[in-house]
Amino acid sequence: MSDQQLDPQALQQEENTLIALRKEKLAAGRAKGQAFPNDFRRDSYCNDLQKQYVDKTKEELAEAAIPVKVAGRIMLNRGSFMVIQDMTGRIQVYVNRKTLPEETLAEVKTWDLGDIIAAEGTLARSGKGDLYVEMTSVRLLTKSLRPLPDKHHGLTDTEQRYRQRYVDLIVNEDVRETFRVRSQVIAHIRSFLMQRDFLEVETPMLQTIPGGAAAKPFETHHNALDLEMFLRIAPELYLKRLVVGGFEKVFEINRNFRNEGVSTRHNPEFTMLEFYQAYADYEDNMDLTEELFRELAQLVLGSTDVPYGDKVFHFGEPFVRLSVFDSILKYNPELTAADLQDVDKARAIAKKAGAKVLGFEGLGKLQVMIFEELVEHKLEQPHFITQYPFEVSPLARRNDDNPNVTDRFELFIGGREIANAYSELNDAEDQAERFQAQVADKDAGDDEAMHYDADFVRALEYGMPPTAGEGIGIDRLVMLLTDSPSIRDVILFPHMRPQA
């Protein structure tokens, strides 16, 4: 590769020249009244034709003379034939000099990669066995003014791929497949829950009290109401209000917003599934989650073995179930139960592990800090980690046998949290006390502690049936199922720092 090819300024100058030439071609089309027509209706998709006629021989296709209308973007132009791409895949279209008018043949020569065309003709098969459309007519629908990335090197700069996802989708089939899978996963989750009598609902994105999770919210102002508001960090408290109101099985798939760090696992705007079912507990949700994950793996991969990087996660086997306390001891045999039950020793262990200890944390909070630093990243195969301390679970029901912990689990796969669930706290007085404790933590410097939500307490005072709820991160789940290393790979338009 020459130095000029590597020089960004030279590359930009070359692109500007190509854009100018394409604009001249568009101007010529406008002068003829042929720019951007919208009167073509296709009757076939490229890949559907490939599948439908895969067994038809060259002779059978010639005899059948099957008429088709296709449309797509030019991805290859060899003069005698072109390859076009639509949402399903690609097909060749043959430029037949015997059947196409001279004027059309002249126009075809001026078309560029990226242009969108409409073609009519009959199906045929080449000597090499490739299916193609022998065109009887073809015309330009959309002129592409910007050239596509170099065909040999493509769009490989990661940041540019995220910033210009539209180009990324045009040139990278694996990226298109990732987002097809994402759509498939969400559709199956919706069907899975509806088949079990769950009702899909929508709850507010703008909230006066950000609740339902320990996170820092985005703040905004409602001008008409002169009211400080927050983009929601979770829909939980509204969904549980609906359970109080009599909708005993509800779910929502929507966006949450958290004004926190960005990493390969975190995006400030992300998609979450939350569902709640009355007359169930967190163990019922574990069973339901295993069933859902197995179905999704089978749907996407045709197997319950999920390859991810150099690992394989086994969804077909029972997920490990282990308490926070026991998991610390299992994965850190140098620690003892006595260490974890002494607040001073636990604080020292948490600090040594790298946790941000502020000094006001109770024993349960310290145990979770130790878990996050010393255990979480070791949980490769699916693990349900249960019995979280009540200090870090202000919305979860206390365990009947040990009131210091709650009937809660988090699901970890590949060292990442994928789901969070619990038997819901439906004791209004206990909920009020826990909100007050959260307010005290916030006053002591915990930015992620929850606000006091008096209306939610009021709702519980009307009575909420025994209920289990769960949140599943859609983005992280899709990462697993598509072997994607970064959350940005599964979000169509991830947030990026503005370019200088």
Curated annotation (Swiss-Prot):
Any one GO molecular function term: ATP binding
Domain of life: Bacteria
CC terms in the record's Gene Ontology section: cytosol
SUPFAM superfamilies: Class II aaRS and biotin synthetases, Nucleic acid-binding proteins
GO terms under biological process: lysyl-tRNA aminoacylation
Residues involved in Mg(2+) 1 binding: 410, 417
Cofactor binding, per record: Binds 3 Mg(2+) ions per subunit.
Keyword Aminoacyl-tRNA synthetase: yes
Binding site for Mg(2+) 2: 417
E.C. number(s) listed in UniProt: 6.1.1.6
Residues of the signal peptide: none
Reaction equation(s) it catalyzes: tRNA(Lys) + L-lysine + ATP = L-lysyl-tRNA(Lys) + AMP + diphosphate
Subcellular location per the Swiss-Prot or TrEMBL entry: Cytoplasm
CDD domains per the UniProt record, alphabetical: LysRS_core, LysRS_N
Predominant location category: cytoplasm
CC cofactor: Mg(2+)
InterPro entries: Aa-tRNA-synt_II, aa-tRNA-synth_II, aa-tRNA-synth_II/BPL/LPL, Lys-tRNA-ligase_II, Lys-tRNA-ligase_II_N, Lys-tRNA-synth_II_C, NA-bd_OB-fold, NA-bd_OB_tRNA
Quaternary organization: Homodimer.
NCBIfam families: lysS_bact, PRK00484.1
Similarity annotation: Belongs to the class-II aminoacyl-tRNA synthetase family.
Name of the molecule in the record: Lysine--tRNA ligase
Organism annotation: Pseudomonas syringae pv. tomato (strain ATCC BAA-871 / DC3000)
Lineage: Bacteria, Pseudomonadati, Pseudomonadota, Gammaproteobacteria, Pseudomonadales
